[in-house]
Amino acid sequence: MNKIKRMFSVGVSLFNIQNLNNDELKTHILKKYKIPAKHENFDSDILNDLKGAFLTEGQNYVKELFGTEKDVNLKIDKIWGNTHVDQSIGIPHNHRSSLISAVYYLTKGKLTFLNPYQLLLSHVHKEDIVSYNELNCDIWTCDMVEGDMVIFNSALQHYAHFDGNEKHERMSIACDMIKGK
């Protein structure tokens, strides 16, 4: 088989964060979660350790994105909690006003990303695909567990996946980060 050179890429960082007080964060979500204005009055000192993790890992992501070792002036623009799968996160969407987004999972959950290169798949027929990979898939679903964090380009279409089989309460805290001046 020929070696395919991957020329363009969409990076998503996935990792597990330890040493955060998840019980305290869950309680905060239950007290502050409001639809539809989830980010209003959500920020709190309780979130400081998590915000530090968002910024540290976001810095690593942006350095790789920009191809630099220099620190980038990154700041959290919005932060909010999610519980269950409401309409605002259960349909494909992106975060247009930010550079990168991050989600920290307080319970298990699924996050699905849509391939931004759909047009390139127009003649790649599903019946011809033997094994799905990053070259031929329409979507990529990440199975998250408590403590997992994902960071991604905010323009990437994504949604919180609910398949109807899970009866647990899905909880996460998300943020949008921008490049400061």
Where are these regions (language model features)?
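Catalytic core of non-heme Fe(II) oxygenases with the double-stranded beta-helix
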Residues: N82-I151, E169
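Non-heme Fe(II)/2-oxoglutarate
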Residues: M1-V72, W80, I89
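Short beta-strand His + acidic residue motifs that chelate non-heme Fe in jelly-roll/DSBH
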Residues: G90-H93, H158-N165
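A short hydrophobic beta-strand segment most commonly corresponding to one strand
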Residues: S101-V103, K167-K181
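Karyopherin-beta/Importin-beta family HEAT-repeat alpha-solenoid scaffold
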Residues: K3-K5, V150, Y159-A160
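Short coil/turn motifs at secondary-structure junctions
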Residues: T107-G109, Y159, I178-K181
